[in-house]
Amino acid sequence: MLDKMNDELSKYKEDIEKSNYSVHELLTLASIVELEAGNASDRGDVAGVFNNRVKNNWTLGSDVTTYYALKIDDFTYSLTNTELATCNKYNTRSTCFNGLPIGPISNPGDESIKATVYPTDTKAYYFVADCGGKTYLSSTYNEHNNVINKLKRENNWCQ
């Protein structure tokens, strides 16, 4: 398994070395992108949003890290505010720390690794997916809430 991962990473070696991430950090972020992106084509966008949050020392704000931290396998389960605020080195929805969790939460595939090495250059800091998995990016929290409200009005909100 480690040999296969080394083979996968070798094609990105030079670009990983130029990035702001260690291999461990890159795999950690790619593991989150793997679970957060509604469609494979959206992975670069999701990685771009997370990259912006990390660069600006924000909390990563990824729900899938909360599910992982709390050992909840059902992503349709509605997390409570108490669960979202739980301090844990994996829970990036809490305000206990900013940036990446301490390690990967899944085994990222090549597409998620590639998206993390080459994230979309975006000004967005927020994203949400509709019921069909289409991802919508927003630059501000107000825009993000407007997208969510629109999806709810259209019965296309599946959170």
Please describe what each predicted stretch is.
Residues 1-159:
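Bacterial extracytoplasmic/cell-wall-associated proteins, especially those involved in peptidoglycan
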